[in-house]
């Protein structure tokens, strides 16, 4: 069954309806879906063309009749990411991205085969939650005034504002899914990646809550890195999963210099977005990187890259990411 979002939805429904209720309801009913890349506006323009992704402003406050670049009539109002919208509406809290090298694929590193990880990225919180206030708006001014006058913070008055929520619930269910995967696949470790040395009450809390969940629910199956050295002199006991953590910027170095020390990664939203793409670059690029957005009831599989309108009709874009995402989907539903 084909359902619509983005350009195909605009063609079918019109009226700026780019994420129809029919689409949401169908995914909820069928429980599993796979989608292609969707255009996401980047800047502060009023409109975006869904054919060539050109962002543009209206004329005298009116919608352009045609795209200023390609002439398409499929120009719609600026919108937040449809990918983020789908994840939040359907509560697809785990973005799951396996990264490995395939024999013969050209790569920028000497030993791409050493990297074989699966990234569990929290999908609904962090700075990607979409709680933003544009610079100069009344809402932004209210928040800035509150932060300065009530909270005693120093902040420039001409700032845009974004909120970074990270919750106990969101963290623990993500880490739980990562540990369960490690158990099911007999993988040696789960690494919590965070920037808790700077953001102590969000990313630092993510780290702490992750360890807390591991000890509460998997005490007989896990050992922390601290326990490994304090109690076992660094010698890994048989049958245990190692729970460890790394600072986010250090982790980018680790996957390059010590890639074979990592198997499952659990991380907040922004870190996971950056890290999974960086890992994909080590093994040949995003064209070979599949992905899934998984909740407790619904799973949505996708290519991890965005749209590339400039390559339309040129027969040169790598379809492997979407094909491999299809393989993930078939494994998820138990068909292979």
Task: Please state what every model-predicted region is.
Residues 9-12, 252-336:
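Glycine-rich phosphate/nucleotide-binding loop
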Residues 11-53, 66-150, 160-161, 270-274:
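N-terminal glycine-rich phosphate/adenylate-binding segment common to multiple enzyme folds
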Residues 11-25, 29, 222-262:
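A structured beta-alpha segment of the ubiquitous adenosine-cofactor-binding alpha/beta core
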Residues 25-27, 59, 88-89, 108-113, ...:
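Solvent-exposed alpha-helices and their adjacent loops that cap or buttress functional pockets
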Residues 57-66:
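Short linker/helix segments within small regulatory modules
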Residues 142, 146-246:
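Glycine-rich phosphate/diphosphate-binding loop of Rossmann-like nucleotide-binding domains
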């Amino acid at each position: 069954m084909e359902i619509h979002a983005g350009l195909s939805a605009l063609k079918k429904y019109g009226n700026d309806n780019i994420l129809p209720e029919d689409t949401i309801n169908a995914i909820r009913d069928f429980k599993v879906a796979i989608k292609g890349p969707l255009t996401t506006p980047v800047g502060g323009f009023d409109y975006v063309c869904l054919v060539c992704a050109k962002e543009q402003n209206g004329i005298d406050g009116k919608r352009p009749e045609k795209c200023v670049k390609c002439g398409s009539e499929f120009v719609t109002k600026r919108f937040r990411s449809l990918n983020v919208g789908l994840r939040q509406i359907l509560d697809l809290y785990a973005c799951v991205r396996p990264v490995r090298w395939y024999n013969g694929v050209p790569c920028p590193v000497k030993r791409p085969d050493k990297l074989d990880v699966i990234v569990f990225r929290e999908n609904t919180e962090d700075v990607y939650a979409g709680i933003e206030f544009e610079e100069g708006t009344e809402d932004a001014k209210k928040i800035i005034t509150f932060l300065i006058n009530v909270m005693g913070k120093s902040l420039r008055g001409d700032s845009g504002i974004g909120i970074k929520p990270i919750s106990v619930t969101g963290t623990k269910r993500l880490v739980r899914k990562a540990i369960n995967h490690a158990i099911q696949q007999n993988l040696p470790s789960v690494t919590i990646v965070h920037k808790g040395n700077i953001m102590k009450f969000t990313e630092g809390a993510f780290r702490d809550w992750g360890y807390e969940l591991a000890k509460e629910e998997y005490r007989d199956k896990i050992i922390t890195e601290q326990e490994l050295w304090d109690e076992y002199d660094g010698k890994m006991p048989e049958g245990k999963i190692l729970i460890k953590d790394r600072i986010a910027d250090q982790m980018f170095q680790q996957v390059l210099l010590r890639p074979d020390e990592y198997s499952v990664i659990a991380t907040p939203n922004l870190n996971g977005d950056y890290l999974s793409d960086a890992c994909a670059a080590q093994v040949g690029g995003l064209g070979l990187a599949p992905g899934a957005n998984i909740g407790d009831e619904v799973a949505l599989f996708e290519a991890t890259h965005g749209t590339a309108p400039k390559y339309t009709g040129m027969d040169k874009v790598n379809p492997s990411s979407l094909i491999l995402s299809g393989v993930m989907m078939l494994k998820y539903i138990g068909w292979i």
